[in-house]
Curated annotation (Swiss-Prot):
EC annotation from Swiss-Prot or TrEMBL: 3.1.11.6
Entry coiled-coil feature ranges: none
Source taxonomy: Bacteria, Pseudomonadati, Chlamydiota, Chlamydiia, Chlamydiales
Locations listed in the record: Cytoplasm
Entry protein name: Exodeoxyribonuclease 7 large subunit
Pfam families per UniProt: Exonuc_VII_L, tRNA_anti_2
Catalyzed reaction equations: Exonucleolytic cleavage in either 5'- to 3'- or 3'- to 5'-direction to yield nucleoside 5'-phosphates
Native source species: Chlamydia caviae (strain ATCC VR-813 / DSM 19441 / 03DC25 / GPIC) (Chlamydophila caviae)
Protein family (similarity comment): Belongs to the XseA family.
HAMAP family registered for this protein in UniProt: Exonuc_7_L
Length: 555
């Protein structure tokens, strides 16, 4: 018995068929009727698709996360987009789906593609017409249904991530015959009144019929004409409408749209947080310096000699003021006593005596001159026989009267001068006493004011120091308390993220024996290969004896 080629193992042949199918049937579209539909708790959908003559197994992984609004059932006519593959353990080929369209939706999809091409040719989807979102929007407009989970999701995200914003909700119908007109009118009115910095056009997921209002030309043209940037958040991540292409930004979900609006705010917050970290470090440094200063001041306060220099300076100042006042008082008192002694002395008496002596001298001199004249007259009388004695006596009496008159006038002048000098001296003493009293009063007021001023300044400095000390101590306690709270929160988060807590609940991690990387899929294992398993309290080496694919088994 001869053979043209060597025999092949079943696995080798199956792998060859699998590679051939996957390379030639990487994208296929199959139309048929569903049967044996099974939606697993994991979200994967296993099904069969058939027509009158044939049957084909299929799987749609993560189906529930993409099409949770409608659950397929046996008998549904569908169009499935996917690729062919081979399940090697059973030698069966199957289709792995990535899109599922119910019968009747094909016409809408064709209309969708035709409208999309026409509007794109007219420039409604041009990238250069896209507007940038504002950095920090102060007013956010939302065009959606006022009832439902969409608006609640948006509000929850905005309240968590945005700061100081104004939200305007324009209620519209998001499904039905009038939905397109209401939505386009809402966009036009928001632009006309310039009510918002950015608009979010939002709706939850649904079938292509439910979302068809957002494929109408009237909405696309309203979005293109809007001067306010618009974020389209219609349906789920796998749902696309013409509004998504016309809008300035497309968000996979309404919650993601709210996050996009707040993204720039988050960046600003990160910048502010970096500034806050710098301020905290600077405050810590400043607080450390102030704490040392407070401790030093506290040591001073605890010591008796802290206020001694201030008290000593104040005492020296008071003594200086008192000494100056005493010196001034002593000077004025000496001057006053000097004038008083001068007034109380026998100066006036001596001046009177001197005037009296002067008068006596004048009288005596006049008397002497009279005697001399008398003797001269007698002598002349004897010598001159023809002298008229009576005439001479008259002349003598006249001269005597003139002399007395001149002497009396001279004495009057001296008396008036003495009286004037006495009056001037009394006036000067009175003025001196008034000035002394005034200066004494001013010095007394100055002493009181200086004493009161220095006492007030000492009290003010003491109160200012106590207030500064209390403020610093309060700030220190507040900062320590806040840092303790932050430390407690971070410690709790680290405890929750600790992988050892996962091990305590009975879980383990597999690592490749040689390469030391984590094993997350059964496809990377081989029979009789060794792996390391990490548990809570140690590690162990295991040998792979059997490999099973849970997803393929369920199909």
């Amino acid at each position: 018995m001869t053979t043209s080629s060597p025999p092949q193992a079943v696995t080798t042949l199956t792998e060859s068929i699998k590679n051939l199918l996957e390379s030639n049937f990487c994208h296929i579209v199959v139309k048929g009727e569903l049967s044996n539909v099974s939606l697993q708790p994991s979200g994967h959908l296993y099904f069969g698709i058939k027509d009158n003559r044939s049957f084909l197994n299929g799987a749609f992984f993560h189906f529930k996360s993409k099409y949770f609004d409608r659950r397929p059932k046996d008998g549904d006519s569908v169009v499935i987009h996917g690729k062919l593959t081979v399940y090697a353990p059973r030698g069966q080929y199957q289709i792995i789906a990535h899109a599922l369209v119910y019968a009747g939706e094909g016409d809408l999809l064709q209309k969708f593609e035709e409208t999309k091409k026409r509007l794109a040719a007219e420039g409604y989807f041009a990238i250069e017409k896209k507007q940038a979102l504002p950095t920090i929007p102060k007013s956010i407009g939302v065009i959606t249904s006022p009832t439902g989970a969409v608006i609640q999701d948006i509000l929850r995200v905005l309240s968590r991530r945005c700061y100081q914003y104004k939200l305007l909700i324009y209620p519209v119908t998001v499904q039905g015959a009038t939905a397109a007109k209401e939505i386009s009118r809402a966009i036009e009115e928001m632009n006309k009144e310039n009510l918002a910095d950015v608009l979010i056009l939002a709706r939850g997921g649904g079938s292509i019929e439910d979302l068809w209002a957002f494929n109408e030309e009237i909405i696309v043209k309203a979005i293109a004409a809007s001067s306010i940037p618009i974020i389209s958040a219609v349906g789920h991540e796998t749902d696309y409408t013409l509004c998504d292409f016309a809008a300035d930004v497309r968000a996979p979900t309404p919650s993601a749209a709210a996050e996009i609006v707040c993204q720039s705010s988050e960046q600003q917050i990160q910048v502010l947080k970096s500034y806050l970290r710098y301020l905290n470090a600077h405050a810590q440094q400043l607080l450390s310096g102030k704490t040392k200063q407070i401790q030093q001041w506290k040591r001073y306060l605890d010591h008796v000699d802290f206020f001694r220099p201030a008290h000593q300076s104040l005492d020296y100042l008071c003594l200086s003021i008192e000494r100056s006042i005493k010196i001034k008082l002593s000077q004025y008192k000496q001057r006053y006593m000097q004038y008083a002694r001068w007034l109380q002395s026998d100066v006036l008496q001596r001046m009177t005596y001197r005037l009296y002596d002067l008068w006596k001298m004048i009288v005596q001199a006049f008397h002497n001159r009279l005697i001399a004249a008398k003797h001269l007259c007698i002598h002349q009388k004897k010598n001159l026989t023809f002298l008229n004695t009576q005439q001479f006596i008259q002349k003598l009496d006249l001269w005597k009267q003139q002399t007395r008159r001149a002497l009396r006038q001279r004495l009057g002048y001296c008396s008036q001068s003495l009286t004037h000098q006495q009056t001037s001296l009394k006036h000067f003493i009175t003025k001196l006493n008034q000035q002394f009293t005034k200066e004494n009063h001013a010095l007394s007021l100055l002493q009181k004011r200086l004493t009161r001023t220095f006492a007030n300044r000492v009290d003010e400095h003491r109160e200012s120091y106590m207030r500064s000390r209390e403020n610093l101590i309060f700030s220190l306690h507040h900062l320590v308390k806040r840092n303790r709270e932050k430390y407690s929160q971070v410690s709790k988060q680290l405890t929750l993220l600790n992988p050892k807590n996962v091990f305590k609940r009975g879980y383990a991690m597999l690592f490749d024996f040689n390469e030391n990387f984590a094993i997350i899929s059964a496809k990377s294992l081989h029979k009789h290969s060794c792996v390391r398993v990490r548990l809570q309290d140690g590690e162990a080496t295991l040998t792979v004896t059997d490999i099973q694919n849970f997803e393929t088994q369920e199909s």
